[in-house]
């Protein structure tokens, strides 16, 4: 049976970057678990902000820099920066470290794989037709400049008795070409029939390497 390598891990350091930019041999486990908790706190607090990823840097043992990439930065920043200040204080109290929170706007969320996956999951949870949702997401991505896109859903689709997998592909998707810029995202839709998994691949062109 064929096995597929993770699109992000396959290209780390070439066309994709790390989500954690630090190294500490002594406290590696502690920092790794803390990173996941930081991401969980921010994502749960701003679930409506369209957060694609959170990159964490640690200049030293006392400071943490969280770079939040979002489609709706205004929700996180708040009026006159009040919301982001409150977030920083909450994180400092919870983790007992100094925090710097930077927000980066995602200009074209229609071609961001993680945001596409979460949007598809959200629509499926609201009982929209998964076929219509997938086709619309593909149309919007191609319209905004994607070179290719694949969306795959797995589970008891439309309440079927037997779980199955369906996918739609538009354009090119050269997964084995290492210079290809492939964005990858996953999400889950919790329905009354069970969990539906969503995977999204977006091909954005080739890097000059």
Swiss-Prot record:
Domain KH type-2: 38-107
UniProt cross-references to InterPro entries, sorted A to Z: KH_dom, KH_dom-like_a/b, KH_dom_type_2, KH_sf_prok-type, Ribosomal_S3_C_sf, Ribosomal_uS3_bac-typ, Ribosomal_uS3_C, Ribosomal_uS3_CS
GO molecular function: mRNA binding; rRNA binding; structural constituent of ribosome
SMART domains with a match to the protein in the record: KH
GO cellular component: cytosolic small ribosomal subunit
Pfam assignment, any one: Ribosomal_S3_C
Record keywords: Ribonucleoprotein, Ribosomal protein, RNA-binding, rRNA-binding
CDD domains: KH-II_30S_S3
Protein's GO biological process: translation
Domain of life: Bacteria
NCBIfam families: rpsC_bact
The protein's role, per its UniProt record: Binds the lower part of the 30S subunit head. Binds mRNA in the 70S ribosome, positioning it for translation.
Complexes and interactors: Part of the 30S ribosomal subunit. Forms a tight complex with proteins S10 and S14.
Family per similarity comment: Belongs to the universal ribosomal protein uS3 family.
Annotated HAMAP family: Ribosomal_uS3_B (MF_01309_B)
The name this protein goes by in its record: Small ribosomal subunit protein uS3
Organism: Thermosipho melanesiensis (strain DSM 12029 / CIP 104789 / BI429)
């Amino acid at each position: 049976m064929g096995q597929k390598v993770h699109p992000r891990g396959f290209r780390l350091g070439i066309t994709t970057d790390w989500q954690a930019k630090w190294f500490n041999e002594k406290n590696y486990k502690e920092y790794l678990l803390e990173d996941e908790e930081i991401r969980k706190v921010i994502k749960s607090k701003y679930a409506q902000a369209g957060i694609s990823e959170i990159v964490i840097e640690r200049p030293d043992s006392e400071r943490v820099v969280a770079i939040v990439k979002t489609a709706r930065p205004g929700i996180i920043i708040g009026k006159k920066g009040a919301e982001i200040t409150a977030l920083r204080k909450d994180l400092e109290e919870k983790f007992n470290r100094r925090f710097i929170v930077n927000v980066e706007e995602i200009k074209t969320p229609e071609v961001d794989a993680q945001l596409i996956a979460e949007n598809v999951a959200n629509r499926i949870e609201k009982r929209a037709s998964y076929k219509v949702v997938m086709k619309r997401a593909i149309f919007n991505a191609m319209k905004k400049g994607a070179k290719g896109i694949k969306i795959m859903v797995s589970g008891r689709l439309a309440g079927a008795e037997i779980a199955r997998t369906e996918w739609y592909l538009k354009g090119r998707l050269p997964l084995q070409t290492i210079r290809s810029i492939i964005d990858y995202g996953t999400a889950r839709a919790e329905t009354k029939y069970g969990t539906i998994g969503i995977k999204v691949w977006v091909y954005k062109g080739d890097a000059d390497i």
